[in-house]
Structure formats: C-alpha cells, structure tokens
Amino acid sequence: MFTLKKSLLLLFFLGTISLSLCEEERDADEDEGEMTEEEVKRSVLGTVKDLLIGAGKSAAQSVLTTLSCKLSNSC
C-alpha cells in the first residue's frame, strides 16, 4: 500500500510540473504574438515615414533646382 501511495504521489508531482511547463510555454507563445503585432505596426509606420521623407526630399530638390535656374537666368 505504501508503494502505491508513493507511486501516485510521484505521478501527481510529475503531472503538476509538466502542466506548469505547458502553461509557461502557452504564455510565452501569446507574448510572442503580441510582439509580432507591435513589430508590424512599427514596420508600417517606418515605411510611411520613409515614403514621406523621400517625397519631401524630391520636392525640395525640385524647388532648389527651379530657384537656382531662375537666379542664374539659365532657364
């Protein structure tokens, strides 16, 4: 009887540990999913920012070209 109780106690202990590890992995997976959404938002904002900077540089370059042309009367 004592051996049976010992075995059941050992099984209960091992089951509790494995359940705890599974819950930790599940929590870690959920956290990784949140980071992915955050990274997507950052990449979209980064792309929009890069496009706006490129458009601003292009507009500034065309304005400067026009001004230099008019100032030097070479248009």
Curated annotation (Swiss-Prot):
Keywords linked to the UniProt accession: Amphibian defense peptide, Antibiotic, Antimicrobial, Cleavage on pair of basic residues, Disulfide bond, Secreted, Signal
Primary location: secreted
GO biological process: defense response to Gram-negative bacterium; defense response to Gram-positive bacterium
Pfam families: Antimicrobial_2 (PF08023), FSAP_sig_propep (PF03032)
Organ and tissue specificity: Expressed by the skin glands.
Propeptide: 23-40
Places the protein is found: Secreted
InterPro entries to which the protein is assigned, alphabetical: Antimicrobial_frog_2 (IPR012521), Frog_antimicrobial_propeptide (IPR004275)
Residues making up the signal peptide according to the UniProt record: 1-22
Disulfide bonds: C69-C75
Protein purpose: Has antimicrobial activity against Gram-negative bacterium E.coli ATCC 8739 (MIC=50 ug) and against Gram positive bacteria S.aureus ATCC 6538 (MIC=25 ug). Has no activity against methicillin-resistant S.aureus ATCC 43300, B.subtilis ATCC 6633 and against fungus C.albicans ATCC 90028.
Family label: Belongs to the frog skin active peptide (FSAP) family. Brevinin subfamily.
Protein name (record): Brevinin-2ISc
